[in-house]
Amino acid sequence: IHRDIKPDNVMISDDGQVKLIDFNASRIYKKDENKDTRILGTTGYAAPEQYGLNQTDPRTDIYALGVLINIMLTGEHPSKVMCKGKFRKIVKKAVNINPDDRYQSCQELMEAL
């Protein structure tokens, strides 16, 4: 999992492909084997579990993607301005405080989009 998805870490290549950079906070996720020992991520994009509330997992990146999608649509963090229309329900689910209530995989988020 990346654990630091934010606009500064998303680049677009010359051929139009989206690339994630800066993997300093990332780790390989193995269910029930990993234990977070440090707070990592960027304020505003980090999921609540990154502040020690729970262990991070792939849903942590889904939270950050929800924030990123909202910023792309509104220019604002979802805590300030939530996008309207069809994307509102998607973003609200992606940035849910409870990881169990978020999309459970990037595939699930992609299908909703």
Tell where the protein language model's regions lie, with residue ranges:
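Catalytic-loop of the protein kinase fold
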Residues: 1-12
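Conserved activation segment of eukaryotic-like protein kinases, specifically the C-terminal portion
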Residues: 36-49
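Activation segment
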Residues: 53-57
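Conserved catalytic-loop aspartate of Hanks-type protein kinases
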Residues: 61
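Short, conserved alpha-helix in the C-lobe of eukaryotic-like protein kinase catalytic domains
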Residues: 65-74
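Conserved C-terminal C-lobe helix
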Residues: 83-97
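Conserved HRD-motif arginine in the catalytic loop of eukaryotic-like protein kinases
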Residues: 102
